[in-house]
């Protein structure tokens, strides 16, 4: 994987907190994400493209529409994310040229309403930003 100019040299799985043995769900990823962007995963990681037997340690959802995000966020948290797991919500950056009504503010606000807090932001690639949402410690 070539790291675009201006981007951290940190591998994306490390930025996303993917650890050896994690169960990872990728939902609605853009074409080429797994092969071209995600890169090599730590040993023992099981990658799923469809929700199956939950819970997952890391869930990465790609959303370019705030209505879809609002409609699915509680389901994404309740049904797929392990109690101490991480939900990454990715949205198109404004500079990407992709038409969207998503932003870090939308992700954060809707997440708070769903009972999760944001703890980390990540540049996924030149098009997508991501915000990590987790349950509060008292709610795990």
Summary of predicted features, one role per range:
Residues 101-121:
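Conserved Class I S-adenosyl-L-methionine
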Residues 71-83:
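A short glycine-rich, Lys/Arg-flanked "PGG" loop and its adjoining helix->strand segment in the class I
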Residues 61-73:
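Active-site-adjacent loop/helix micro-motif of nuclease/hydrolase catalytic cores
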Residues 16, 21-29:
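Conserved class I S-adenosyl-L-methionine
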Residues 81-92:
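Conserved beta-strand signature within the Rossmann-like core of class I S-adenosyl-L-methionine
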Residues 114-140:
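Class I S-adenosyl-L-methionine
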Residues 30-37, 97-99:
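Short, charged/polar "capping" segments at the starts of alpha-helices
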Residues 45-56:
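Short acidic low-complexity segments
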């Amino acid at each position: 994987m070539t790291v675009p100019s201006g981007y951290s040299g940190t591998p994306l799985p490390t930025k996303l907190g993917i650890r050896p043995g994690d169960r990872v769900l990728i939902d609605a990823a853009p074409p080429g994400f797994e092969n071209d962007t995600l890169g090599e995963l730590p040993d023992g990681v099981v990658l799923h493209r469809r929700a199956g037997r939950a819970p997952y340690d890391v869930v990465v959802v790609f959303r370019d529409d705030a209505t879809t995000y609002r409609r699915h966020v509680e389901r994404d948290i309740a049904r797929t994310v392990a109690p101490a797991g991480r939900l990454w919500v990715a949205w198109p950056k404004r500079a990407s040229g992709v038409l969207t009504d998503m932003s870090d503010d939308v992700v954060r606000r809707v997440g708070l309403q769903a009972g999760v807090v944001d703890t980390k932001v990540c540049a996924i690639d030149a098009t997508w930003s991501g915000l990590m949402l987790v349950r509060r410690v008292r709610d795990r």
